[in-house]
């Protein structure tokens, strides 16, 4: 059975992005270790998804009839496509820039499209239950400063947020590759990237 990998990038820095470099290295490593890996790529910065509108959300919840609203119908169709792409993937690799203590808004727009009650989680008698337990998610994060420890640690809202999101969706096979301090000089950046790539080299096959 062919394994499907969804590769997402969210940094707006293009070729200057460390997280893009790391996510590409992850996909390359997994492809080398996994025969016939089927990779789909989506650049959330170059081709950003629209943020959820009130009408789209209302229509999705059954509170608004969008049958005569072409714009909302198109937005719903796009959301369905993004959701299906996620649901049919076995592995998801995400490159994440760290902006103002959190994730890029482009990535948040994607998360809003895949966090769908009845599809990726459900509400039961005991509360919410994730429905995506069979997936593996690998997140590559680049941070300009040091947020894993020290006085800035309480300001880290990217890795912690994504752990919360994917755990909520039922995903327990969740890995983070982090390069931090990349804006603290060339020596610090080189050491951070090398450490991250050393970790990537040890990743198991898809």
Tell me what each language-model feature is.
Residues 12-14, 145-146, 183-184:
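Short histidine/acidic/glycine/proline-rich micro-motifs that form metal-
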Residues 10, 142, 179:
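Cofactor-binding loop segments of dinucleotide-utilizing enzymes, especially the Rossmann-like FAD-
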Residues 117-121, 172-173:
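Short, structured loop/turn "capping" segments at alpha-beta junctions
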Residues 2-96, 101-105, 109-112, 116, ...:
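N-terminal beta1-alpha1-beta2 submodule of the flavodoxin-like/Rossmannoid cofactor-binding fold
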Residues 89-90, 134, 171:
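Short, well-ordered alpha-helix to beta-strand connector turns
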Residues 3, 149-206:
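Glycine-rich phosphate/pyrophosphate-binding loop and the adjoining helix
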Residues 6, 40-42, 138-140, 175-177:
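Hydrophobic/aromatic beta-strand patches that form the interior of the parallel beta-sheet core
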Residues 123-168:
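Short, glycine-/small-residue-rich phosphate/pyrophosphate-handling segment
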